[in-house]
């Protein structure tokens, strides 16, 4: 079974697939945070206009930017997301049993749901703040 036949989220378990996301990555040879080392630490490159070096762990969804050439991706990952289960996996994706993989992917799915829920809550709170402000302005105008 080829990597392309895997669901997109599962393709990210393959280091080569993660490496392929590092197009226009500013740190190449002579740096600690090369695309290969970033992918080894679980990161994918997801740049934005304002954050060209934004990288996100595909597993815990922690986003880090402001990379320096000497930053060690695994150490930075541990420092900012020490509970990421991906960091404790000692086998390659292809070596995991089905049971091990499904248990691991269940953790990734829980992380994704938590991240999305947190984002929606922030969005709701921002909207509620704007609505409250508009209501207060209406009340003050009376």
From Swiss-Prot:
GO terms for cellular component: centriole; chromosome passenger complex; chromosome, centromeric region; cytoplasm; cytoplasmic microtubule; cytosol; interphase microtubule organizing center; kinetochore. The record marks 126 as: Interaction with FBXL7. The BIR repeat is necessary and sufficient for LAMTOR5 binding. Monomer or homodimer. Exists as a homodimer in the apo state and as a monomer in the CPC-bound state. The monomer protects cells against apoptosis more efficiently than the dimer. Only the dimeric form is capable of enhancing tubulin stability in cells. When phosphorylated, interacts with LAMTOR5/HBXIP; the resulting complex binds pro-CASP9, as well as active CASP9, but much less efficiently. This is Baculoviral IAP repeat-containing protein 5. The keyword Lipoprotein does not apply. The modification Phosphothreonine is found at residues 34, 48, 117. It holds the Pfam family BIR. GO terms for biological process: apoptotic process; cell division; chromosome segregation; establishment of chromosome localization; G2/M transition of mitotic cell cycle; mitotic cytokinesis; mitotic spindle assembly checkpoint signaling; mitotic spindle organization. Belongs to the IAP family. Keywords: Acetylation, Apoptosis, Cell cycle, Cell division, Centromere, Chromosome, Chromosome partition, Cytoplasm, Cytoskeleton, Kinetochore, Metal-binding, Microtubule, Mitosis, Nucleus, Phosphoprotein, Protease inhibitor, Repressor, Thiol protease inhibitor, Transcription, Transcription regulation, Ubl conjugation, Zinc.
